């Protein structure tokens, strides 16, 4: 069977892949094939914001990775949920819209990466965004990604913000604006009571384009190479190995784990690692698969009565959630429009720290080990 040929082949229909496919196919003369290992984003758990609590701790639309034992964590393993569906992790996460601090981007540029300063990337953030709350120099209107406050406003949110103020963290309505530090309600990627994932924002409106082909359940096996040039991607689908070719570029947007893994499977990486795994070395590139950095969550839980407007395991909580599910199904309103994580704060660990280095996430429920461990009752 002859391989189909496109101008661009994109591996991974996550946040980057969906946006890339949409932008590239704005030109009707450019053809794109987008490969996704997961399935279509049809599940109600994706579209109902509260469905995050069912997907993150399980393998529903989720790779649910475990790390190897970490020396810095006394040998413990870390849990790494990652989306496996159209939209990638934007289809299973808590939908919090949080940009990096200005310092982060300026630091990247200072390290020798032109085009990555805050002033360089801000117009791109604005172009992609439609913010229902803020229309100023820091936010966009009319973009595909809808950003708003959560429709369901639990009274418990106000208690968190009051507690933050008492402890010296003032209210900052827009942490994505001029100043990051402060306490706030999270801005979220919701639209009309549903999750606004990268797939829903960028991909779904453009699926009818004749120059865009989306292939789901396509597990990429390797990048095909001719000499030092990437020419396509071999992938498994339905038990068969297939190949798609690229005239211009092969773009890997399979995530922090998926992209380096595919490079290594293609023979691109540290020669010693590839030889140990029995992979022929095509290009000795020692940095592939190294230097992953991620933040760590420290979870603290406080018990609250079951009548509190929170999520929990109790008769009262179950009855409340059942009613909320019916309300959401009919009207796209109510408790199920909550991302569970509702408020937060950025602050400095010490007065002499230049930028906020600590982040708080306030959750309307007991979240132990990414909700993989359930507890009776209610808490925050």
Q: What positions do the PLM features span?
A:
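FAD cofactor-binding and catalytic pocket of flavoenzymes
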Residues: 301-380
């Amino acid at each position: 069977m002859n391989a189909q040929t496109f101008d661009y082949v994109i591996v991974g229909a996550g946040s980057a892949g969906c946006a890339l496919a949409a932008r590239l196919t704005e030109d009707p003369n450019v053809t794109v094939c987008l490969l996704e290992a997961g399935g279509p984003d049809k599940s109600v758990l994706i579209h109902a914001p509260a469905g995050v609590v069912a997907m993150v701790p399980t393998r529903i639309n989720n790779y649910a990775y475990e790390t190897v034992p970490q020396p810095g964590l006394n040998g413990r393993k870390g849990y790494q949920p990652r989306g496996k569906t159209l939209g990638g992790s934007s289809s299973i996460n808590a939908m919090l819209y949080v940009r990096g601090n200005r310092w982060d981007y300026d630091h990247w540029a200072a390290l020798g990466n032109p085009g990555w300063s805050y002033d360089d990337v801000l117009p791109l953030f604005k172009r992609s965004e439609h913010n229902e709350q803020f229309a100023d120099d820091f936010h966009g209107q009319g973009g595909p990604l809808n950003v708003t406050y959560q429709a369901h406003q639990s009274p418990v949110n106000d208690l968190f913000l009051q507690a933050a103020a008492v402890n010296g963290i003032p209210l900052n309505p827009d942490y994505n604006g001029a100043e990051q530090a402060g306490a706030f309600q999270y801005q979220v990627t919701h639209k009309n009571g549903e999750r606004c994932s990268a797939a829903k924002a960028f991909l779904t409106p453009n699926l009818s384009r004749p120059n865009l082909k989306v292939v789901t359940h396509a597990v990429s096996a390797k990048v095909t190479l001719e000499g030092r040039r990437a020419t396509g991607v071999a992938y498994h689908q339905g038990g068969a190995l297939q190949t798609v070719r690229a005239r211009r570029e092969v773009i890997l947007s399979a995530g922090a784990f998926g992209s380096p893994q595919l490079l290594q499977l293609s023979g691109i990486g540290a020669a010693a690692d590839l030889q140990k795994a029995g992979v022929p070395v095509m290009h000795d590139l020692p940095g592939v698969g190294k230097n992953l950095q991620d933040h760590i969550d420290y979870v603290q839980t406080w018990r609250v009565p079951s009548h509190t407007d929170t999520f929990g395991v109790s008769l009262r909580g179950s009855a409340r959630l059942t009613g909320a599910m019916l309300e959401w199904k009919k009207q796209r309103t109510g408790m199920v429009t909550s991302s569970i994580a509702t408020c937060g704060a950025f602050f400095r660990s010490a007065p002499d720290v230049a930028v906020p280095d600590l982040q708080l996430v306030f959750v309307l429920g007991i979240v132990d080990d990414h909700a993989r461990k359930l507890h009776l009752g209610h808490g925050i």
